[in-house]
Structures are given as C-alpha cells and as structure tokens.
Amino acid sequence: MVQDLEQKLWSIASGIPFSSDYFLQASPIRKLKKENLFSKVFETYFLELGSGWGEVAISMALQRPNTGFILMEKKFDRIRHTIREIEKHSLDNVKILCVNFNWFLEEVFEENLFSEILLNFPDPWPKKRHHKKRTVNSKFLESLKILLPEKGKFYFATDYGPYARKIIRLFRDSKAFSPEKVELKSERNEIPVSHFERKKREEGKRIYYIDRVLVQK
C-alpha cells in the first residue's frame, strides 16, 4: 500500500503539462547529481524550497553567476512566470523542479549537493490539529542533514511567532545545527526580500529569521 502511494505521488510529480529547457526531471530510481543539473558544473549550489514567483532566486542568480540555483515549486502559474523571468535575464544558472518538496526531497538529490537551502514563509498551519502538516519537523531536519555538507547553511523565515518558537526548539533538540550568531534575527541581509515578505512588512507584521549552520552530520 505504501509503495503504491509512493508510485502514485511520483507519477503526479512527473506530470507537468508543459515543457521547458529550464525544467529538471525527478526520478524515483536515479537521484540528481551536480553533473546533470546544468550544462556545466558550478562552484556551489543553492536550493530554494517553494520558490513562488522566483524573484528571490533570480535576484541572487544575477549576483552570483558561479552558483547554480535549483527551485522547487508546485504551482504552474508561478513556474511559468519564473521561466519568463529566467529567459528575460538570459540566466544559465537557474533550473526548476515542479515537485512538491513535502512529498520528495532527499529522494531527489544526491547527498551533500547544496551549500545553502532556503525556505521562506511556508504555511504555518496555525490550528493545532493541522500542526502535523507543517514542513519543518524532525524528519525535515534529517533531510537537511542529507542534502547539506558540514558548514552548509539553512535559511528560514516566517511571520508566525509560535511556528518560529517551535522551530527554534527543534533545532535545539537536534544538536546537528548551530546558529551563526543568534537564534532569532529581525533582519537578514543575505537573502533578497520576496514579494510576500514585503507585503507582510507593509502590513506591520514582524518577520522571524532563523538561520542555521550544519555542524554535525
């Protein structure tokens, strides 16, 4: 039963209704390696989970031509918009995976592939009965440990305080991750501001930044 469900999810994940040279194809039998992501091998690789309209990764890709950016996004309208922006800027260091990363993550990529992973404003699922749907949990931290090398970085942002506090506790319990300086930041300069983040700031919402370094595999 579990195997049948997994096969069905892989089938859904592979069912993209349009094609693009900027797509990567996930496979249940072969993990993606840095040698087959782009036409060349980059110095470092950056993964954005839930890339939305692509503005964050595209801004960073323009500034960091020696880094390969992989975007995981499941919504077709956002993917189409991102592709148009990639083409507009003639970027050769951005690729997209149309895969729900809550279904498949470490199953898709080889170990230690990414030096940085970004997760911006995932659904906080505020109601207690929905907490099990939250992306960041102990299993997710294990996935980060697989995909990041030692000293690899994870960037996270949310505007929901209880979720931020829960994640801080998860990282404390893990022991594998360490804050760079402080456990919680109110500003972050390493990552461009997304449309969603700007909107929340304009609404007067507090943004919680939780950035961690992998110190123990």
From Swiss-Prot:
GO terms for cellular component: tRNA methyltransferase complex. S-adenosyl-L-methionine binds at residues 48, 73, 100, 123. Pathway: tRNA modification; N(7)-methylguanine-tRNA biosynthesis. Keywords: Methyltransferase, S-adenosyl-L-methionine, Transferase, tRNA processing. One of its GO terms (molecular function) is tRNA (guanine(46)-N7)-methyltransferase activity. Its EC number is 2.1.1.33. The active site is at 123. It is an enzyme of class 2 (transferase). The keyword Phosphoprotein does not apply. InterPro entries: SAM-dependent_MTases_sf, tRNA_(Gua-N-7)_MeTrfase_Trmb, tRNA_methyltr_TrmB_bact. It catalyses: guanosine(46) in tRNA + S-adenosyl-L-methionine = N(7)-methylguanosine(46) in tRNA + S-adenosyl-L-homocysteine. Substrate binds at residues 127, 159. SUPFAM superfamilies: S-adenosyl-L-methionine-dependent methyltransferases. Belongs to the class I-like SAM-binding methyltransferase superfamily. TrmB family. Catalyzes the formation of N(7)-methylguanine at position 46 (m7G46) in tRNA. NCBIfam families: tRNA (guanosine(46)-N7)-methyltransferase TrmB. This is tRNA (guanine-N(7)-)-methyltransferase. It comes from Leptospira interrogans serogroup Icterohaemorrhagiae serovar copenhageni (strain Fiocruz L1-130). The gene is trmB.
